[in-house]
Amino acid sequence: MIPVTQDLQLNIVRYTAEQKTVWDSFVATSKNGTFLFMRDYMDYHADRFADHSLMFYKGGRLIALLPGNESDDTYYSHGGLTYGGFILSYHATATVVLEAFYLLCRYLKGTAGVGRIVYRTIPFIYHNYPSEEDLYALFRLNARLTERKISSVVIPEKGYPFSTLRRRKLKQARNHGLKVCQDENFDA
């Protein structure tokens, strides 16, 4: 691990249920948080995952959240969610995130006896604002990539070209009377 030389005076606080409102408010105003990180959603599987979510403060101001759980000597971000990773304030810079990772490693090793971190990033397509400081920090800390998942998206305004097979199947559906229409009658 590469030591970070700047002392940004970051502090880690382990999340407790009393901090739910603060957590949820932060997620709602972050640059990369999604509904998956709201506590009601996260706590749905609380019986299956030993929650060890963390809150990072800089000078008394909440700057980042890390939804996480631990199992044996491994910390996951977060095993009960589709994706995890640091949820960042608009004030979180690359330097702050690098320092947060360094502090995270020290904290987990010293406090929780964790020897391994499995970090899953938030796919960029879900960001409210471009935010890949965590990827840079992982590179700087010589993290090892063990898995790569794909994220694909179709932007409705731009459309997506259909393949020949898809066009043929759409034509068959129309010929068989299939119609897609919008309806407000939900009782039907």
Predicted segments with their positions:
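Short, internal active-site loops enriched in acidic
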Residues: 122-127, 159
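Acidic-and-aromatic substrate-binding clefts and catalytic sites of carbohydrate-active enzymes
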Residues: 94, 125-130
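Acyltransferase donor/substrate-recognition loop-hinge adjacent to the catalytic core
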Residues: 1-20, 131-188
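Conserved donor-binding loop and adjoining core beta-sheet/short helix segment
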Residues: 5, 25-28, 40-111
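Short Pro/Gly-enriched beta-strand edge/turn motifs at strand-loop
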Residues: 33-41
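Conserved GNAT acetyl-CoA-binding A-motif
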Residues: 112-123
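A residue-level signal for conserved active-site and pocket-lining positions in enzyme catalytic cores
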Residues: 23, 60, 119, 180
